[in-house]
Every structure is written in structure tokens, then in C-alpha cells.
Amino acid sequence: MAEKIQFELVSPAKLLVSSKVDMVVVPGAEGDFGALALHAPMITTVRPGVIDIHDGGKVSSSVFVAGGFAEVNEERITVLAEEAIPVGELTAEMAEARKKAAKEALDDAKSDRDKAHAGRLMLVAEAMAAAVA
């Protein structure tokens, strides 16, 4: 049997996942990456998207994250997510409401900082819409 890696997914609200799994596929800043046992150590940012948790030769669960950071070493991957929602709990209405709020924030933005924040909200909304599609 192949070695497993300890996966922990933490949001500001709570610890969502803490279990040994075969592999975790994370939406990294430079593209998706898979983390297995004995992975080379790294720290990276996580872009809005879906984390797929593989166990038993298949995707056992998927979680939408709004971004964050990931730390990987030979034994563990820890994702600190800004927000995390199991994909099964997402709805098209949630994604549409986020898009509407992001568009309103972009329309109301006056400063470059406000525009950047609204752009980030739109990225999260679009990633959420893709996750439920």
C-alpha cells in the first residue's frame, strides 16, 4: 500500500479536514499541483478554486477555497484558506450572488485599492461559478 500524506484544511472559522489521504490536488498560484507523501517541501499561495482530495484511487471529496496559503513537506500538507466550502454545499445562486456583489463593488470602487479588492471578489465569484458548473 502506498504511503499516505496528512492533509489539514483550516479556515478562519474551523479545522475542516484533518486526515491521511493518498493525494491532494490544490489550485496553486502557478497552476494546480498534486501533493503526495514524500513531496519536496514548499510554501505557495492558493488561488480561488477547488481542492480535490484523493483516497482509495478516486476523488473522495472536493472543497472550494477562496484563496490562501499551502505548506507542503514530506509528511503533511496544510492549507490555510481564506474561506472554504464543501463543493456539495455550493449552489449556482450563491455564485451568482457573489458575482453581483463583486460587480457592484467594482462599479462603486473609487481608489485603486478598492478596484483591486473588487477584482479579487470577482475572481472568487468566477471560481465559485466554475466549481458548481
UniProtKB/Swiss-Prot annotation:
Name recorded for this polypeptide: ATP synthase epsilon chain
Membrane topology per record: Peripheral membrane protein
Gene: atpC
A GO CC annotation given for this chain: proton-transporting ATP synthase complex
Compartments where found: Cell inner membrane
InterPro entries referenced in this protein's UniProt entry, alphabetically: ATP_synth_F1_dsu/esu, ATP_synth_F1_dsu/esu_N, ATPsynth_dsu/esu_N
Function field: Produces ATP from ADP in the presence of a proton gradient across the membrane.
Subunit relationships: F-type ATPases have 2 components, CF(1) - the catalytic core - and CF(0) - the membrane proton channel. CF(1) has five subunits: alpha(3), beta(3), gamma(1), delta(1), epsilon(1). CF(0) has three main subunits: a, b and c.
Keywords: ATP synthesis, Cell inner membrane, Cell membrane, CF(1), Hydrogen ion transport, Ion transport, Membrane, Transport
PANTHER family: ATP SYNTHASE DELTA/EPSILON CHAIN, ATP SYNTHASE EPSILON CHAIN, CHLOROPLASTIC
